[in-house]
Amino acid sequence: MTAAGCDSRSVSELQRYSWGETSNPTIVLLHGLTDAGTTWPDAVRRWQGGYHLIAVDLRGHGRSPRFEPDQLTRCYQWWLSDTLDLLSTLDSAPVVVGHSLGGLFALRAAAARPELVRGLVLEDPARPPGAPTPDPEFVAMNEAFLDSFADGGQTQRDRMRAESRWAADEIDQWAASKPLVDRAMIHDGLTLGDGTWEPVFNGLTVPTLLVAPTDSPMAPDPALITNPLVQQVRLDGVGHTVRRDDAQAYHAVVDPFLAAVTAGSPAR
């Protein structure tokens, strides 16, 4: 990412990026499947003035390590371990903002080690199917999707500029991340472990904002969420990539939550 003030380095094996003053409250950004830590440019523009932002390339993505062959059946364990390792390196607990796959592991990290997390923003987090092996249809869909970037991503860039409301640099960084995906992970590693879902939300002990499309098939059933710490917002006219699809609506609900959760945040 070329945003001003970006520092890029490897921490605990993962490729890490940061923006903003380290004295500000920290937000950790966890991306979705096939994206990278560089795919947040619009959010960075909006938040870097008031927060210290940290993003990583999740294992198997971007410039972070590939999975070893004997790790592919346990990718979900590595993603959680990597997330906890990252959070444990920070001087104070951050708000963790996660989309899709990143949202799932932000959720699991907060459930496992709540003392490491100040709050959560979960953008249509991935619902784990609980299956012991990858879904062949889901694998084939992702492989075909990544194959469509064989021309360097120009066709997909043009399509998204014509069809979406995404910011131009969001499209560019999204497309640039696809050739960097670990294809062995896509073919053999797409299992997410335990399929428990709504009970994980009900067990959270940190302030949490869930933002999802009104018709999301992955979001928890609102009627089954009884935890008063979990705020749920469902938005019309957006898909799985809520933030990119309607940045104004996303930030209208997320930014006040961040301000409230980080009010009085200790200096780093």
Regions found by a protein language model. Give the residues of each.
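Structural signature of beta-strand start/N-cap positions in the alpha/beta core
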Residues: T26, H52, A93-V95, L116-G119, ...
